[in-house]
Amino acid sequence: MLRPVSIDDLISDTVPAKKPRFLIKKRTFPQPEEEEASKALSHTVIKRKDNYRNLDEDELYEEQVSNEPDDLLFLARKSADLLKKRQNEDESIVDNYLGKHWSEKKYEEMSTRDWRILSEDFNISSKGGTVEKPLRNWHELKLIPEDLLNIITNDLHYNEPTSIQRSTIPNVINNRDFIGVASTGSGKTLAFLLPILIKLHGIPPLNSITKHDGPLALVLAPTRELAQQIQHEGQSITKLWKRPCNIVSIVGGHSLEEISANLRDGCDILVATPGRLLDCLDSHLLFLKQVNTLVLDEADKMIDFGFEDQLTTILAKTETISNRQTMMFTATFSPTIEKVANGYLKKPSYVTVGGEESKPKIKQIVRYVPDEEEKLKILVKDFLPNYKAPIIIFINYKRTADWLFDKLREARFRATTLHGSKSQEQREHSLSLLRNGKVDILIATDVAGRGIDIPNVSLVVNLQFPKSFDSFVHRVGRTGRAGKTGTALTFLTEEEDHSAMAKLFDYVKKNDFTGENYISKEAMSKYNVDKSSYKPIII
């Protein structure tokens, strides 16, 4: 006979009332790690529950104190493991919500978002093909051999790579052809020299046989001044390097006999202007049998100067070299440049360095001073003593250069001149004096000054306004380079062309990247400039 149903039985067998559907919490299926943590937690609680049954209050307190830290540590470790996995899968919760910057992370912790922010920080953009991630610093990934790294950082004090260096070096080291669009003064010379030297690091030095087969690397530049500047910068590294490395330049102004003597012992890196290089090739002074790296520096200027045919001829002469790697640097990417790139570069990585960094940080000052002696007085009193060397003063005529040189020497300023009447040897000597700090001021005409690449120019002076507006832009561009701030002082007289003045004032207005550009009241009045658009100069 069945026993009567008790009240307790009824209570225990009652099916719990269901919650309304909208109150039921959606079930989520735990990941294996979560199940493991859950089981461990459950096991811990059950074990402790069993242990507590027959303990008095004092024993229970002691058991709690002895077990709780271990349980919490176990749970903390499990939680940390789960969080780390989720962070890796979802580009890091901490990054997205707490804003941990890429510079605070190790390389392997970098997410896609971090690389995007790094590129934005340094104004680097890319398109087409595969592009390697930019360098975060010189030391990471050990891309640069230790001996070269010590020269770059300790001896030459290049503390951080520039934007173009960050993007060029990883791509070139991975044997990609490369196109870099960057302004002059962005540090691109080191950007292509360093990968060349890294490649040479793993190649035996030239011997009595291979030295006759031509250079291992060829750099083409539009002007002799730029070619010599590249040679000078390369030699500043190689003279400190244990590996023998000969850098030779071939430019106009040097006889074929002199060039032949320089090439007698062979050269690892040859820097040349297109026309003079073809002269040497036609005269069989050298061959291009073993060029494994070809650099076109300032390719847009080479096209502008009419070197397109010469350029394509040289490219064709090295086309048969199967392992040739080509780098092209240009400030603009015109259809002509694109045609050359499509014809001679193989699936290149394409990087543009632009944005705020490429905008020249130049404070422009325009003054109307018709009297030459008054210009000199303002220059000597208000400007030259207040700016660090090097300083460049542009003039239009040789006689003005000689007159100004004498006046500055009387005022105890150290200066040198650069103009068309000087020989190539004299020009090189003047530039050497400036670069080595033996003089502070260079007085130059446009013809002589074209293509000169002098770093860290603090002040450019247009003592006489140039005959073309393009020359003015070129002059002013000698300062405010590679992220540094510079000043350009322009003197006007009553003889200036009004259409050129309209261009000048418009240029000064639109290129006020420092917010400090000024035009004097006298200049505005003389050339009928809208006074509401410009601030008067205060000196």
From Swiss-Prot:
GO terms for cellular component: cytoplasm; nucleus. It catalyses: ATP + H2O = ADP + phosphate + H(+). ATP binds at residues 182-189. Its EC number is 3.6.4.13. A motif (DEAD box) lies at residues 297-300. It is found in: Cytoplasm; Nucleus. The keyword Hydrolase applies. GO terms for biological process: mRNA processing; RNA splicing. Keywords: ATP-binding, Cytoplasm, Helicase, Hydrolase, mRNA processing, mRNA splicing, Nucleotide-binding, Nucleus. Component of the U5 snRNP complex. The Q motif is unique to and characteristic of the DEAD box family of RNA helicases and controls ATP binding and hydrolysis. ATP-dependent RNA helicase involved in mRNA splicing. May destabilize the U1/5'-splice site duplex to permit an effective competition for the 5'-splice site by the U6 snRNA, resulting in the switch between U1 and U6 at the 5'-splice site. May also act to unwind the U4/U6 base-pairing interaction in the U4/U6/U5 snRNP, facilitating the first covalent step of splicing. This is Pre-mRNA-splicing ATP-dependent RNA helicase PRP28. It comes from Kluyveromyces lactis (strain ATCC 8585 / CBS 2359 / DSM 70799 / NBRC 1267 / NRRL Y-1140 / WM37). The lineage of its organism: Eukaryota, Fungi, Dikarya, Ascomycota, Saccharomycotina.
